[in-house]
Amino acid sequence: MADFLAATRDAPAHPSLLRALNCWPAEPANALDLGCGAGRDSLHLLARGWHVTALDRDAQALSTLALLCPDDARARLQLLQRSFEDADPLPAAHLINASFALPFCSPGRFADFWRGISNALTAEGLFVGHFFGERDAWAGQRLLTFHDRTALLQLFDSWETLHFEEHEWDGKTAVGQRKHWHLFEVIARRS
């Protein structure tokens, strides 16, 4: 985890979060950053005036985010050290960000965790996140969750889907390991 945190601590916010923020019609409100890591997305949200609850199972990730948080934003940052499997109930939020995070929820607990996400998101709230597809190099690892296109679209049946893209490419992980990626990027508004 230390290598991942070092590799991502100065990275800019994910483009998917920036796209989602362009869909937000109101003043900044409460955001929940799931699997926040070193805080690249949390820090961007704080800089834009949001109140952020950053959740990660790793204490070092949360410590890194706390160190990087500007003094004038500390009162708007809450840190929660929990795994996805132990995160119920989630705090209410107007925006839930899950950049490259949800695949790390165990498959047997994903449905409950997704229900928790749906319940935590306010009406008209935005979800933005990534899901690994079944052709991802890590597919088959029993502790990770993967989706096919049909199953993923069913998760958002009653939502307004604002952005849905499927990507597949050969690249590297944040720590430089070669990997075949199969990824879905979703931005949706809760009805």
Where do the PLM segments sit?
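ABC ATPase nucleotide-binding domain "signature" loop
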Residues: 104
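A short glycine-rich, Lys/Arg-flanked "PGG" loop and its adjoining helix->strand segment in the class I
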Residues: 111-123
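A conserved beta-strand element that flanks and buttresses the S-adenosyl-L-methionine
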Residues: 97
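Short catalytic micro-motifs in class I SAM-dependent methyltransferases
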Residues: 100-101
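Class I (Rossmann-like) S-adenosyl-L-methionine-dependent methyltransferase catalytic domain
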Residues: 1-28, 32, 37-88, 108-112, ...
